[in-house]
Amino acid sequence: NDVLFNLLDSHDTERLMNRFHDLDKFYQQLAILFTLPGSPCIYYGTEIAMEGDHDPDCRRCMPWSEIESKEHQEKIAMMRKLIMLRRNEKVCRSLHFHFPNGYENDRCVEYIKLDEEGNKIEVLLNASDEEIKVKGDGEVLFAREFDGEILGVNGTLIRRM
């Protein structure tokens, strides 16, 4: 539904990073959030992978001194990439998607997003503990742990088809 309000953490839950303690898994979850239907919502601190257990620990103060010292620049840049991808690629906001099951590995999640003009993107998440040889090609829009052919363990690939 296009009016869903999607979030992965909030003032009522443990923070996303607390569930994984792994940036690659963290960004896999955010890639899903920014490519599925609905409105993605980011809780303050998620852009820097802030940790925090259940309430009240999830309501820690924003670490402004760390941000001002540019300690989190790479994380902020990754979040900006995902936000800009969602903003600039209409297909990311489309309601239409399917799971082609094109990979034998059960821990490889692949879905194809389509829009009304026929544009397509593929979202590929390697949740296994083995590298995956990526099939086909396309313009890479967002990637982590991807070398152009192999999607590494806990890797993420979003590409135009």
Model-inferred region functions:
Residues 26-27, 37-42, 46-161:
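Carbohydrate-interacting/catalytic domains
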Residues 1-37, 48:
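Alpha-amylase-like alpha-glycosidases and glucanotransferases acting on alpha-linked glucans and related
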